[in-house]
Swiss-Prot record:
Cofactor(s) for this UniProt protein: [4Fe-4S] cluster
Record keyword Iron-sulfur present: yes
InterPro entries in alphabetical order: Dihydropteroate_synth-like_sf (IPR011005), IspG_atypical (IPR017178), IspG_bac-typ (IPR004588), NO2/SO3_Rdtase_4Fe4S_sf (IPR045854)
Keyword Metal-binding set for record: yes
EC number: 1.17.7.3
The family this protein is said to belong to: Belongs to the IspG family.
Gene Ontology MF term list: 4 iron, 4 sulfur cluster binding; 4-hydroxy-3-methylbut-2-en-1-yl diphosphate synthase activity (ferredoxin); 4-hydroxy-3-methylbut-2-enyl-diphosphate synthase activity (flavodoxin); iron ion binding
Family annotation (NCBIfam families): ispG_gcpE (TIGR00612)
Name of the protein: 4-hydroxy-3-methylbut-2-en-1-yl diphosphate synthase (flavodoxin)
Binding-site positions, [4Fe-4S] cluster: 568, 571, 602, 609
Length: 663
């Protein structure tokens, strides 16, 4: 299989795409990344829709989408256009179409772009299981062409662009039966429609591969880019994690998916889907886009590194086990979290640890490992004594200006793990190896931690360690280019079993949230990393960073430490107040660690985008809700006033309920 989906995974270069115009906005080519959002007003409500569109435009949104589910909605588009013209608005509009080709033919006359979902534009979801012969499959494609071609020709005639937007949760029965519920199925679904459009000489196309799981979403976009390379296609990509949710969780998932793809040079326009006021999506999208609009190509230091991943499938990078008393990491253990704390004296240190435990208790999480940040050598004895009061390992991060003399090496034998830079702390390589051997013989671990610009100098060290039998070593980096440099480290270590700790040091919690989600999150979804360690320079941020670390693991779906919510951002199809409903359900179920609950406004993507959710709450009509167990409806048309209670009872009936703690 050809794993190439971009110029290189080890440096930045934006993928070259054709330019597609959406009204006066240019997407792709050499243009900046374009920011989009979607209103959640009913499209038949002219004033409500216009108000939201203008608010988004003022916030910096460059393209606005609105749902057009019925003929009545399409008929109201001229009124919306007229009011926008009066207000002096020039923002291009996108009509979002599902199930209704006839409505698309009307809507195309009043918008700059049409979005169609290849999973339901010409197909009705029946969840039928059948094997298609090649002849039957081609007959299905001919049927689709008959339904889709009139819209393509009308778009071509009017100069209207189109997004062919695949959703992981709404693949057609035909695709599901041939390719399964997979990234490959998502890609082939879009390609079927692209080929039809191309056969009619239409190329003003933008493509998306959305999923609520960032891992699936990233794999699908990479596979699409790889297939585009094979087929000599250069269509721009619209990036988004659908149903990302709200608050920090929604922002983390979006940054993992969108940000890591932008790092790979993929993406020409983005939408951050939050279950919040649409205006609040824009600053998040701008933050992500600005980072990459300012980024210049950098392929200077990529030679000598080779791809060691399957970028289209999750496979954890295998490493040997780290075992310190009850602490276990690496091998098949969950990704662990290490917390950095300062040390002034025993009392303040133990007080900070106690606060961390207390905060962790409120999250139903216990701290797992502590690293003392750059203590003075004469503090080591006091730290060692304080650590005896704790049941978790306490390691030492050596200050860069500390030289590892023999006296200090002996004192460090009191600590289960130390972190040092081999290029700063040892002048003599033989002495370093002797030191590592001594620690291993004592059952202790050492973390080799250096800067990303020293990677070339690090290349021969794993071979040397293996040759002399040193195994109790893990590797980490201090880098501003977390994703690229850790991929380089992964390439160096791919023949070995040394564990990798993903380290990120940031100036404040907001920077930590976005950049750790992009860098560390982007690595985790590829199976790279056995531990993570995120820090800022301020002790007051410790609790926030502690929670961020576990939220990041939750966002990658690698470790669930709280209830997982999949909730759509709401649109004109939504049949209830989604933000209020989501908040209400969270208040009832937020203590159910590891349970996945989907809250969906309507049935368009609801059942499918619930993906691997355990339970679903999906709008079925005004004042009515369907409740799901997995993808199966178990209660239909439940009155919304009792739906919350019925959901709780459904969770209880399936043995996944536990009463909230009184702590």
């Amino acid at each position: 299989m050809n794993f190439r989906y971009n110029q290189t995974p080890f440096g930045y270069q934006r993928r070259k795409t054709r330019e597609v115009k959406v009204g006066d906005v240019k997407v792709g080519g050499n243009n900046p990344i374009v920011i989009q959002s979607m209103i959640n007003s009913d499209t038949t409500d002219t004033q409500g829709s216009v108000k939201q569109i203008l608010e988004l435009e003022r916030a910096g949104c460059e393209i606005v989408r609105l749902t057009v589910p019925s003929q009545a909605d399409a008929d109201n588009l001229p009124s919306i256009r007229q009011e926008l013209k009066k207000a002096g608005s020039k923002v291009p509009l996108v009509a979002d179409i599902h199930f209704t080709p006839s409505v698309a033919m009307k809507a195309v006359e009043y918008v700059e772009k049409v979005r169609i979902n290849p999973g339901n534009f010409a197909d009705k979801k029946k969840f039928a299981v059948r094997d298609y012969t090649d002849l039957e499959y081609n007959q299905e494609l001919e049927r689709i062409s008959e339904v889709f071609s009139p819209l393509v020709l009308r778009c071509k005639e009017l100069g209207v662009s189109m997004r062919i937007g695949t959703n992981h949760g709404s693949l057609s029965d035909r695709i599901m039966n041939r390719y399964g519920d997979t990234p490959q199925g998502m890609v082939e679904s879009a390609l079927e429609f692209i080929r039809i459009a191309e056969s009619l000489g239409y190329y003003d196309i933008i493509v998306s591969m959305k999923a609520s799981n960032p891992q699936v979403m990233v794999q699908a976009y990479r596979m699409l880019a790889s297939r585009f390379n094979e087929l000599k296609m250069d269509y721009p990509l619209h990036l988004g994690v659908t149903e990302a949710g709200d608050g920090n969780d929604g922002r983390i998932k979006s940054a993992i998916g969108i940000g890591s793809l932008l790092e790979d040079g993929l993406g020409d326009t983005i939408r951050v889907s939050l279950t919040e006021d649409p205006v609040l999506e824009v600053p998040v999208a701008k933050l992500l886009a600005d980072k990459f609009n300012k980024k210049i190509s950098n392929l200077n230091s990529v030679k000598g590194y080779s791809e060691f991943r399957n970028p289209f499938s999750y496979n954890r990078f295998y490493s040997s086990e780290i075992k310190i008393v009850q602490f276990e990491a690496g091998e098949n253990h969950p990704v662990r979290v290490e917390t950095i704390l300062p040390f002034e004296n025993s009392n303040s240190f133990l007080e900070n640890v106690a606060k961390l435990y207390q905060y962790g208790k409120s999250l139903s999480i216990e701290p797992e490992s502590i690293l003392v940040d750059s203590p003075l050598p004469d503090q080591l004895k006091e730290i060692s004594e304080a650590a005896t009061a704790l049941s978790i390992p306490v390691g030492i991060l050596l200050s860069k200006n500390v030289s590892l003399n023999e006296k200090l090496q002996k004192e460090l034998l009191s600590f289960p793990k130390i972190v040092f830079d081999p290029f700063l702390q040892f002048q003599d390589g033989e002495k370093m190896l002797s030191f590592l051997k001594e620690r291993q013989n004592a059952g202790l671990f050492s973390e080799i931690h250096t800067s990303g610009d020293k990677l070339d100098s690090l290349r021969g060290l794993p071979d040397t360690l293996s040759e002399i039998g040193i195994k109790n070593v893990l590797f980490s980096l201090d880098s501003k280019e977390i994703l690229y440099d850790y991929r380089k480290l992964g390439s160096i270590l791919s023949r070995f079993e040394f564990p990798i700790l993903l380290h990120g040091s940031f100036s404040n919690p907001e920077e930590a949230l976005y950049n750790s989600a992009i860098g560390i999150g982007g690595l985790l979804i590829d199976g790279i990393g056995d531990l993570i360690r995120i820090s800022t320079s301020k002790i007051k941020d410790i609790e926030e960073i502690f929670q961020l670390s576990y939220d990041l693991l939750q966002g990658t779906r690698l470790r669930l430490t709280k209830t997982e919510y999949i909730s759509c951002p709401s649109c004109g199809r939504t049949l209830f107040d989604l933000q209020e409903t989501t908040a209400r359900i969270k208040s009832r179920t937020g203590h159910l660690k590891g349970v996945k609950i989907a809250v969906m406004g309507c049935i368009v993507n609801g059942p499918g985008e619930m993906a691997d959710a355990d339970f679903g709450y999906v709008g079925a009509g005004p004042g009515k809700v369907h409740l799901y167990r997995g993808k199966e409806i178990v209660l239909k048309n439940v009155p919304s006033e009792i739906a919350d209670e019925k959901l709780v009872q459904l969770i209880k009936d399936n043995g996944l309920w536990q009463d909230p703690s009184n702590d």
